[in-house]
From Swiss-Prot:
<dbReference type="Pfam" id="PF22589">
    <property type="entry name" value="SPMIP1"/>
</dbReference>
<dbReference type="InterPro" id="IPR054323">
    <property type="entry name" value="SPMIP1_C"/>
</dbReference>
<feature type="compositionally biased region" description="Pro residues">
    <location>
        <begin position="61"/>
        <end position="80"/>
    </location>
</feature>
<protein>
    <recommendedName>
        <fullName>Protein SPMIP1</fullName>
    </recommendedName>
</protein>
<feature type="region of interest" description="Disordered">
    <location>
        <begin position="55"/>
        <end position="80"/>
    </location>
</feature>
Length: 176
C-alpha cells in the first residue's frame, strides 16, 4: 500500500482531530487507572528487592559454674579429625607447575595441565577401586576402524525401482 501524499485541509483536520482524541483517551485512562498501575509496579519492585534480615549480635557466653577442686578429673583427649581425602591422588609437582606457565589461549597453562592429566590412566589418578564404568569405558582400548564394504551394483539394484517408474529422469537410474 502506497503512501498518499495528496493531503488537503479536510484530511489534515481529520488527522488532527484523531490525534487529539487518542491523546484525550490516553489521559482519561491514566487518570482512571494510573494509581492502580503505580501501586502494582511498587509491589513488584518491593518483591524483587532482596530480603534484609536483622543483624544478630553474638550472645555473651555464660560462665560455667566453678568445679570443686577436690579431685582432679581426667580431661578427654581431643578427637583426632579424619584427614580430608579426595577422590584423586595428589598431582605431581611437575604437572602442577604446568598450570602457571603461560595461558590457555596459547595452548599452555591450564590447557597443557589438563592434557597431561588426561594422558594418565584413570587407575593411576583415582584412589577408589575400579568400578564397572572403569572396566567398560576406560579399558576397552582404542576403537577399531571398520571399512565399509559396498559395491555400486548392490546400491543400484536395491535403491532404484525396477518397474521403470521415473525412467525419464536418467536412463542410468533404471536397474533392469
Amino acid at each position: 500500500m502506497s503512501r498518499q501524499l495528496n493531503i488537503d485541509a479536510l484530511r489534515q483536520n481529520f488527522w488532527k482531530e484523531e490525534y487529539l482524541r487518542e491523546k484525550m483517551l490516553r489521559c482519561e485512562w491514566y487518570r482512571k487507572y494510573g494509581s492502580m498501575v503505580k501501586a502494582k509496579q511498587k509491589a513488584k519492585a518491593a518483591a524483587r528487592l532482596p530480603l534484609k534480615l536483622p543483624t544478630l549480635h553474638p550472645k555473651a557466653p555464660l560462665s560455667p559454674p566453678p568445679a570443686p577442686k577436690s579431685a582432679p578429673s581426667k580431661v578427654p583427649s581431643p578427637v583426632p579429625e579424619a584427614p580430608f581425602q579426595s577422590e584423586m591422588y595428589p598431582v605431581p609437582p611437575i604437572t602442577r607447575a604446568l598450570l602457571y606457565e603461560g595461558i590457555s589461549h596459547d595452548f599452555q597453562g591450564r590447557y597443557r595441565y589438563l592434557n597431561t592429566r588426561k594422558l594418565d590412566m584413570p587407575e593411576t589418578r583415582y584412589l577408589f577401586p575400579i568400578t564397572t564404568s572403569f572396566t567398560y569405558g576406560w579399558q576397552l582400548g582404542p576403537p577399531v576402524k571398520q571399512e565399509l564394504v559396498s559395491c555400486k551394483m548392490c546400491r543400484i539394484e536395491s535403491f532404484f525401482r525396477k518397474n521403470g517408474a521415473f525412467a525419464l529422469l536418467d536412463p542410468r537410474d533404471l536397474a533392469l
